[in-house]
């Protein structure tokens, strides 16, 4: 039973236990999120390969394209989901049942409206999309695929989002991760079986949507069981402060995730969409693992801010920033080295499109690495609720991405859209680092610059250190052996450079690990 259902009790004892509780929840969230992302990555590699072999690049591109167009319904969210999660922090930290119930009720109403908007949006897409996509499939074929895919998205908005946001804000995101992981595993196993048995893509995607229907239902059951919310509460005014101020940040996030495939769908071919999708599943899979390592940190930032524990906040942010920069540099450098050998192995036997595009691989890797570097600064801004103050930069980021992608796609194709993504993400990352230093934790921007310079140095040293390796694996086993060699060398370089430039942080990390072993 969550804290909002417990009487106030002894405040001093609660304060003493609060730090321990936060640390324990952060651990559960981090482990749960990492497990979820690993499940996502494994599923993300298995299913597209089945699609490519069974249905070809055109169908794989069509599925990716439809999913991205449906993803644009998230624009109707208007950024409210981030603001809702931030709004939950204070009432949950202070055990305010009434205020928590009001936010839950207001949010639920809003997202049910979005669910209705989704139905209208899908109806419009069913008429317009077949006219803009370059394919030989009939309108009916495409529209039925749209309907099969959209069912799960509708259920998410109608039942699930508010409950998921409440759990994340209460540092119980691990519940969401457990439910989501089970759904993904079931979907992967059943979808592969259906494809193996030769069923049509429409039925495969329909079964997937039905499986994912269970997620929001289970969220609802858990929240109803563990939270004493007044779901019939009436209130005057809007309980969600700054409700619309997350709009700009939200537009930017949706544009970054969906623009590339939309631009390729309209101005290029489904084969290019399929190629983009294969590379994207690799880079986003790695990015998600890095970002998941920071799962629960926004809620912890929010809790520290709500309790005005600024010194703890600054110390924790410094460690978080160092950890994310180090992890991002290591993981994305290794991925940049291994991505082309992997694509060679992964697409072996697929001859209806050319999946070997090295320059695109470099640019899309850089873009997602920069996006991961943005994570600590973005999480702090969201936790502090500084939506309105940073919204102009969000519009600029989205504008750069769209404008450069559209201009460049005609001559450069996949490389052009990757350039647009990289430029938009780079601008936003540098802006947020500057804003944070000036307005939230008040520190010198040189901290960020130092991290970037050491990141760049690490990349070059790792690349020069592995020049002697052969990069032509002839199968998955050979690729795994290559990956182990590259990873060991890269890890050694990162440890050495961190001992030189971040000795204090490394010592603290070693002491923490030693302490955890003793307490285990």
Region locations from a protein language model:
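Interhelical loop/hinge segments that connect adjacent transmembrane helices in multipass membrane
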Residues: 2, 6-26, 201-205, 217-258, ...
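Membrane-interface helix-loop junctions in multi-pass transport and translocation proteins
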Residues: 52-54, 58-59, 174, 182-216, ...
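Membrane-proximal transmembrane or re-entrant/amphipathic helices at the cytosolic face
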Residues: 1-18, 466-520
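Membrane-interface junctions at transmembrane-helix termini in multi-pass inner-membrane proteins
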Residues: 23-27, 153-178, 197-202, 223, ...
């Amino acid at each position: 039973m969550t804290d909002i259902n417990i009487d106030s009790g002894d405040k001093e004892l609660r304060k003493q236990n609060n730090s321990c509780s936060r640390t324990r929840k952060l651990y559960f969230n981090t482990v749960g999120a990492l497990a979820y992302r690993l499940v996502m990555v494994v599923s993300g590699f298995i299913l597209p390969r089945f699609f490519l072999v069974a249905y070809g690049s055109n169908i794989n591109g069509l599925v990716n394209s439809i999913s991205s167009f449906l993803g644009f319904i998230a624009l109707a969210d208007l950024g409210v989901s981030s603001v809702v999660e931030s709004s939950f922090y204070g009432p949950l930290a202070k055990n305010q049942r009434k205020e928590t119930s009001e936010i839950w009720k207001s949010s639920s109403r809003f997202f049910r409206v979005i669910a209705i908007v989704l139905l209208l949006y899908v109806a419009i897409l069913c008429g317009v999309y077949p006219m803009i996509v370059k394919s030989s499939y009939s309108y009916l074929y495409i529209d039925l695929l749209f309907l099969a895919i959209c069912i799960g998205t509708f259920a998410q908005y109608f039942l699930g989002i508010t409950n998921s946001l409440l759990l994340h804000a209460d540092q119980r995101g691990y519940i969401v991760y457990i439910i989501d992981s089970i759904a993904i595993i079931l979907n992967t196993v059943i979808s592969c079986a259906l494809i193996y048995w030769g069923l049509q893509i429409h039925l495969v995607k329909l079964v997937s949507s039905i499986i994912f229907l269970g997620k929001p239902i289970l969220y609802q059951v858990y929240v109803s069981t563990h939270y004493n919310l007044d779901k019939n509460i009436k209130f005057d005014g809007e309980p969600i402060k700054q409700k619309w101020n997350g709009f700009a940040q939200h537009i930017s996030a949706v544009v970054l995730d969906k623009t590339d495939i939309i631009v390729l769908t309209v101005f290029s071919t489904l084969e290019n969409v399929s190629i983009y999708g294969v590379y994207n599943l690799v880079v986003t899979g790695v990015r998600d693992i890095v970002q998941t390592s920071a799962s629960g940190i926004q809620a912890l930032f929010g809790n520290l801010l709500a309790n005005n524990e600024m010194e703890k906040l600054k110390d924790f942010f410094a460690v978080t920033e160092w950890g994310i920069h180090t992890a991002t540099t290591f993981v994305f450098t290794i991925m940049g080295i291994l991505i082309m050998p992997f694509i060679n192995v992964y697409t072996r036997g697929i001859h209806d499109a050319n999946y070997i595009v090295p320059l695109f691989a470099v640019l899309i890797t850089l873009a997602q690495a920069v996006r991961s570097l943005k994570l600590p600064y973005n999480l702090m801004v969201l936790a502090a609720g500084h939506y309105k103050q940073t919204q102009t930069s969000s519009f600029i980021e989205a504008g750069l991405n769209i404008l450069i992608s559209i201009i460049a796609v005609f001559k450069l194709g996949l490389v052009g859209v990757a350039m647009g993504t990289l430029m938009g993400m780079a601008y936003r990352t540098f802006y947020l680092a500057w804003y944070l230093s000036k307005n939230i934790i008040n520190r010198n921007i040189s901290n960020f610059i130092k991290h970037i310079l050491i990141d760049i140095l690490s990349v070059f040293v790792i690349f020069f250190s592995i020049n002697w390796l052969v990069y032509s694996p002839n199968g998955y086993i050979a690729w795994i052996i290559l990956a182990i060699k590259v990873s060991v060398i890269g890890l050694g370089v990162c440890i050495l450079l961190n001992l030189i430039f971040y000795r204090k942080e490394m010592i603290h990390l070693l002491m923490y690990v030693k302490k955890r072993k003793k307490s285990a």
